[in-house]
Regions:
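Catalytic metal-binding/acid-base residues of hydrolase active sites
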Residues: 80, 122, 173
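Structural recognition of alpha->loop->beta junctions
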Residues: 86-106, 183-198
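His/Asp/Glu-enriched, well-ordered alpha-helical/loop segment
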Residues: 70, 74, 139-140, 148-203
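Glycine-enriched alpha-helix->loop->beta-strand junction motifs that scaffold or abut catalytic
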Residues: 90-95, 111-116, 135-137, 163-165, ...
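Short acidic active-site motifs
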Residues: 24, 83-84, 105-106, 154-155
Length: 203
């Protein structure tokens, strides 16, 4: 099948069970990593019908978080679907990236555990815009990009109003390099004060 961005095999970090999870973290540390990022759910650009499904059992994520902590590393979780986010937050990840379909329960958990939300509004806008272009994405991806991309703005607004901690971030490889600063504009447009947006990237 067509692979848009390439999918890693077991040697690159696909884990099946706690033992694989420990090995993957240790291998990444050996390779020079100082942060671990997991895909707690599928993605908008995953070559699959849905980007919402959880991709880890909660105990696998917990094992990743605990092992990363042994090497003074935090864990960030790419996530779009609510169930995958909840598992990741309860397991102790430091941040949720994208968080598009975040629900009220997830926001409550994030506040309880002090988990940061990195909304990547620019990425949502980018994929939604490109979904309008015939042939830009494979047909299995295009409906997801058109549906999920625009929702990040609303999620950001709700999370901000709910008091979830928010950190600045874009999505390397999706929105264009060198245009990261546009994220500040989006954050202010959707509710933050200019100083809050600046502090989200610097504090």
């Amino acid at each position: 099948r067509f692979e848009l961005m390439g999918n890693p095999g077991p040697a690159e970090g696909v884990v099946n069970g706690i033992s694989d999870a420990l090995k993957a973290v240790r291998q990444q540390y050996k390779n020079g990593a100082d942060l671990i990022k997991i895909t707690a759910t599928g993605g908008v650009l995953s070559v699959a019908k849905s980007g919402e499904n959880p991709q880890f059992k909660e105990e696998e994520i917990q094992a990743i978080v605990e092992t990363a902590a042994d090497y003074d590393m935090h864990v960030a979780a790419h996530a779009h679907g609510a169930e995958g986010m909840k598992r990741a937050v309860r397991a102790g990840v430091r941040s949720i990236e994208h968080g598009t379909l975040m629900d009220k329960e997830t926001m409550g958990l994030m506040k309880k555990y002090g988990t940061y939300y990195v909304p990547t509004i620019s990425a949502g806008e980018f994929v939604a815009e490109k979904a309008k272009v015939d042939g830009y994405y494979p047909e299995i991806i295009r409906p997801k990009a058109a549906k999920i991309g625009p929702q990040i703005k609303n999620t950001f607004q709700r999370a901000y109003k709910a008091g979830v901690k928010i950190a600045f971030g874009t999505d390397s490889g999706v929105s264009y390099h060198g245009e990261n600063g546009k994220e500040f504009l989006h954050m202010v447009e959707w509710g933050m004060t200019p100083m809050e947006a600046i502090l989200s990237a610097t504090k």
